[in-house]
């Protein structure tokens, strides 16, 4: 058995309604496979629009092996000169806040997001220009301002910063679960299931789960994260790059408040490709390197942090946050990014299966965009809207040339 989701595709000559009448099985408008942030929001959005939706997940929404798992994710507007993702972040933040307010779950924390850069601050300047064009609120900091506002950070080569006060942190695992729960309230039928890999081209009429259930639908969306390349090896095996990413939490000294909000926001050091979050819910200072780790199999990779990365992260924390130089590591996680060659999302139709769609390639920055991905995909599925070329399968190469950060 390969991958978390394995789906057997069946191509037949009869139409959906004829099959349903003959077999008595229910036919959905859309079946979504994968209940991570892309799949959950897609199912929710389609159901809100009146579609009959099945949502299939082998483990649980936001499970520990998923790219959408874990406790926290950043939602930020800054993307250098890339206006597309800045505007998608804006739209998604509005929808996250509206949704979480409606379901009365405080799973967005407005910590603010602080970007910092040294001598090479061209990307920071490009971010400022884009935020201005998009009407995003931000505050610029020079070196003196950063030193005064954040004395707990050893700035060293850092010269400039920008602060996004409206941005912050989503409590990821719980947020995905909340979206799925509300989707079910809206009529989505949830299945915990596996199946076999696709075998036939053409129009897919139904998938067969490992429990023997046939799920018939007019269209199928595969939002399976790091498993997309295993489910569709011929098409995506060389174009989806699951990478090992190690995350660390450092304990905060007793009575210390400088490392929790509002004393410390969510933060990113541009040249170092390091990001982190303040002490949230007593978990400690979160830190991770944003460089892509080694390529891994999401089913078999070790979930234990390496001695080499542990040493590197300890050294970095001691340098940037001297007060935490002797702080204990209180928690670790090994997850994965699900990268495309450029870092752009993959939202496109299967080249040989006319009613099968891919939704993936989150590339380490996708979680925040769940609502916007769902809106875009619904427009493709239901209205045939003009596609964004950057999301096409055609643009996904077999070697990594990252351009989106």
Predicted feature descriptions by range:
Residues 98, 118-187, 191-192, 197-203:
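Flavin (FAD/FMN) cofactor-binding and adjacent substrate-gating region
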Residues 44-48, 104-110, 219-222, 226-355:
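Active-site substrate-recognition segment that forms the wall
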Residues 26-28, 210-219:
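Core beta-strand elements of the Rossmann-like FAD/NAD(P) dinucleotide-binding domain
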Residues 24-36, 54:
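Beta1/beta-strand and adjacent pyrophosphate-binding region of the FAD-binding site
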Residues 316-405:
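C-terminal catalytic lobe of FAD-dependent flavoproteins
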Residues 39-40:
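N-terminal Rossmann-fold NAD(P) dinucleotide-binding loop
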Residues 72-149, 273:
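Dinucleotide-binding Rossmann-like beta1-alpha1 core, especially the glycine-rich loop
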Residues 47-68:
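Glycine-rich FAD pyrophosphate-binding loop
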